[in-house]
From Swiss-Prot:
It catalyses: Co-precorrin-6B + S-adenosyl-L-methionine = Co-precorrin-7 + S-adenosyl-L-homocysteine + CO2. GO terms for molecular function: cobalt-precorrin-6B C5-methyltransferase activity; protein methyltransferase activity. It comes from Saccharolobus islandicus (strain L.S.2.15 / Lassen #1) (Sulfolobus islandicus). S-adenosyl-L-methionine binds at T24, G48, C49, G50, T51, G52, D72, A101. This is Probable cobalt-precorrin-6B C(15)-methyltransferase (decarboxylating).
Length: 199
């Protein structure tokens, strides 16, 4: 499948899905990718790649001169990300690694320009600490979080480690759903997008 547009936000239904594997939804994904400020040729790390929606879109943004690493502890997620990367024709500049963060991050022999941390890991502080070690100076980290505890732990860890220009945005998306009498707006869970830079 070809995505002909230069902006992120591929519709969710374009991706192969699995109910057991989480997905960063299209509106949240578009905002998170904009907060990453990806450039052509960047090295990107997607921690907790899930369905691969962020991995695929980041790959489209970095182009053939960049590379995106997708990491997930679930074999099903790695396989699903691979299938979605194949579907969008970007498998050539994606590296998939099965393993649990933060431990697996120290086995990757790369430094990254941008790191995306998806989901709500209980090890968010340790993952942020590991990210500091493998991100280049001037690099950006973006975290999606659902739980307030994750937000609190992430902000605290980023401040203590030395990330600068911290920003937190709460996003509430409502999608229209047809009913018998009209269209109702169905609200999704609020998502927090946290970003910071290593200077």
């Amino acid at each position: 499948m070809e995505w002909k547009y230069v902006i992120p936000g591929i519709p969710d239904n374009f991706f192969e899905r699995d109910e057991e594997i989480p997905m960063t939804k299209e509106e949240i994904r578009a905002l998170a990718l904009s907060k990453l400020r990806i450039r052509k040729g960047d090295m990107i790390l997607d921690i907790g790649c899930g369905t691969g929606s962020v991995t695929v879109e980041a790959s489209l943004l970095v182009g053939s001169t960049g590379k995106v690493y997708g990491v997930d502890k679930e074999e099903k997620a790695i396989n699903l990300t691979r299938r979605n990367a194949e579907k969008f024709g970007v498998l050539n500049n994606i590296v998939l690694i099965k393993g649990e963060a933060p431990e697996i991050l120290f086995t990757i022999n790369e430094k990254f320009d941008r790191i995306f941390i998806g989901g709500g890991s209980e090890k968010i502080k340790e993952i942020i600490s590991a990210s500091w070690e493998i991100i280049k100076k001037g690099g950006r980290v973006v975290i999606d979080a659902i739980l307030l505890e994750t937000v609190n732990n992430a902000i605290s860890a980023m401040e203590n480690i030395g990330f600068m220009n911290l920003e937190i945005t709460e996003v509430i998306i409502a999608k229209g759903m047809k009913t018998k009498v009209g269209t109702a707006m169905m609200t999704r869970n609020p998502i927090f997008i946290i970003s910071g830079e290593k200077q």
